[in-house]
Amino acid sequence: MPSRVLSLLCMVSFGAAAYAGSAKTIPSYGQVSPSFEVNRGQTDARVEFLSRGPGYTVFLMSNQAVLSLKRGTRSQTVTMRFAGSNARPSITGLHSLPGKTNYFIGNEPRNWRTNIPTYSEVLYRHIYPSIDLLYHANQRQLEFDVRVAPHADPNIIEFSFTGSRALRVADNGDLLVTIDDGELRFCRPHLYQSRGARRQALPDGSYVLIGERVKFSLPSYDRTQTLVIDPMLGYSTFLGGSADSFGNAIAVDSAGHAYVAGGTTSSDFPATSGSYQQTYGGDNGGGYQGVIGDVFVTKLDVAGRRVIYSTYIGGSGGEDAYGIALDASGNAYLTGGTNSLDFPVTPGVWQPVCCGLTDVFVTKLNSTGSSLIYSTHVGVGGEGTRGFGIAIDGKGAAYVTGNAGPGFPTTPGALKTECNCFTDGYVTKLNPQGSNADYSTFLGGSSVDFGEAIAVDTTGKAFVTGYSSSGDFPTTPSAFQLTNKGGVDAFVSVLNQNGSALAYSTLLGGSGNEEGYKIAVNHGKAYLTGYTGSTDFPVTAGALQTTYGGGSSDAYVAKIDPSKSGSASLVYATFLGGSGDENLNDFQRDILAVDNAGNVYLTGATTSTDFPILHPTQATSGGGWDAYVTALDKTGSRLRFSTYLGGSGDDFGRGIAFQSGGIYITGQTYSVDFPTTSGAFQSGFTGTSDAFVTKIGNKLSQ
């Protein structure tokens, strides 16, 4: 018989604490270490596990957690104790991590502690009768589940704090623990009802204060079914003005700040004081090739509550940004399309002049959003010429792909220097100063070809995906698929370091149409997604979904190993979709991310009411097109998480990024009831359509 438990997810945040009697915000206490190390004598013997981060340490003991917080010369200890609990529960580390901890203190080897194992979770079994406690950590938050087995009484769960000054429940249901120089925030307990592989959100629980003690108040729930809380909706906000706004791409820095790029036709889009361009200059009526409005770039704080900077970029014509990349200093690299003769360019760049139709642009914005480090056109006069994907290498060189026609600038010795059709894909590598092209080449055959996305590996090879209708698209002998099987097929091409030859190139498709929207590279392997209309798309045995879901198109996910040949180079390929349509949107180009372990994170849009979901934040479609957010395991055979994201109007996921603190999504919504979180930067729908930015906390099915 399957286990049935009640799980309460609670989360304490160490950041964004407020001074007593003041609205001022304290900088974060630091990032929580995403691991727990077992105590092997490196600390007090009463401690079972500990988790260290800049400015604090968490010590897990038999029935309490001790938070030791430090800022400068100030320090404070706060203890959370589970009252009346089992004094000797079984305590186990779960999900061993590859890293080990070593302590070399002093010059006596007998005092050293080495090869201490680390874990991503710590489980307390039977901390109360038939009730377990599970701790998690990510970079900025400590989370714990309280798991209540069938017929156990959740009312016996009770905890208290020592070292705090006061407790209160905020208007949004969070528990606030006042300390000497701020507050610790415990998010309100979230509940989900499990029914097989699907989870249905239930009304949230709440905290009840009884003097200095804290208990849970829970809604009615079906005691015959599993009740769980996975995962957290970290934040969700609208982003826009009174007209149209759409987020096309997103990137996240190591601290958890989200950078969003897209387009807007709103003259009142929220630009910030001191940003590069604070006023709108775009063309809302005469846009050529569908390029209207201005680019926007917005940087949000880690809580999604405040805009750090937000700027327009554009001239008197139309612009749109489709790709964004970040360097280690927080500078943002952008690409897209412009038809503005006065698009902002900087001195000494490769191409300072616009053709007057549509041009590719590449712009490097500084870390404060206040000035352009460089900005250049790329292209001379092709109809519909745009940049769709951008990537940077460790030296700051920018790699761009998109579509272009005859006359697009190429470099001597490049793979293909002439376009012999209406439009080809292209790959251009700009030097770190933006003053010249290290190489620039067309990529395609004798018919229509588009480059949609690009990634760069550590050796400087460029991985490109897109689509081709050419019967002679260039493939390599080691390709998985040498020839076009339908009207339009996706492709994956790997260019050598100087853009002169293909290291690997394959088509990918069935008898219908396919496009490649996004590519990522991890340990030399290529991961891509897009849409397919082929029931015979080449899926692999054991993949998550081996049959076409229905409708006009499904999403797909594929992993390719260019070091192998033929069928061996297709590591896995799977459909992803229900009985409706998926990913039929030309501007969903930044919709895949990959973590270091090879897990894949996806967004897009679906009309399917039976789209595959697991542990959702939203279990059912809101209507029309809804965004989806999905995580696949490294084998491509199992969902780790999947959810709808949207309201009663149409919603499109257009960009996704992953950091260990969570999954970050941007896109476009037409829903006045798109889900937002309390305290979000913009909680109300203000335009014809708005961009959205959503973070989903990283607590996925293991």
Model-predicted regions and their roles:
Residues 6, 19-242, 249-253:
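Residues that cap or anchor secondary-structure elements
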Residues 7-16:
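Bacterial N-terminal signal peptides
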Residues 1-5:
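Positively charged n-region of N-terminal signal peptides that target proteins for export
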Residues 75-77, 84-86, 154, 215, ...:
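A sequence-level/structural motif corresponding to short, flexible coil/turn segments enriched
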